[in-house]
Amino acid sequence: GMTGYQETLTDPSYAGQIVVMTAPHIGNTGMNTDDEESRRIWVEGFVVRDLARRPSNFRSERPLPDVLAEQGIVGITGVDTRAITLLLREAGVMRAGVFSGEAAELDPAVQLAKVQAGPEMTGRNLTSDVSVTTTRVEPARGTRIGPLAVIDLGIKESTVRHLAQRGFDVHVLPETATWADIAAIDPVAVFYSNGPGDPAASDRHVAIL
């Protein structure tokens, strides 16, 4: 929709992907620190129909284009995003490219070759890119249930927050965690987060489970 794009951009599940928004106007509410789902933007590219360069919202801290530029995320506007969505619906996920600067002047055949040479998502493991490197704990709120071991394969901050609100002391462990690391917490349950890449590349995590 017109809002929620900040949560999408900072969702680790979209690492390595170009995201296409179907709502026509994006950027109206700007960007703020409260709605971020992780420590940075993870998408590789951002495609919108119409970009609002000047936000109008009392919670806005910075314009969307400024944050994209600061983090080196390429974006494109003035695109028929719904036509792209219809194509993706029929053909499925595919490799793509957004070219800017000098790369935008390359011959289309060269641009296509660069896209075709890019990595496919099949067999790709991106969990090590997005996971925490050290364990962190989010204390329980309300009636305490006990410790919950969360294997961070690309978890969103809102998920951690909601688990804590339901009474768990949320221990967010790196994706490299072993069974010994999990057992040391003496958890009442183990939670595997969602994340980016191909689930088939997570055999090690499945083996622990």
Which role does the model predict for each range below?
Residues 184-209:
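Cysteine-nucleophile active-site neighborhood
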Residues 1-180, 184-185, 199:
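RNA-binding accessory domains that recognize and position tRNA/RNA substrates
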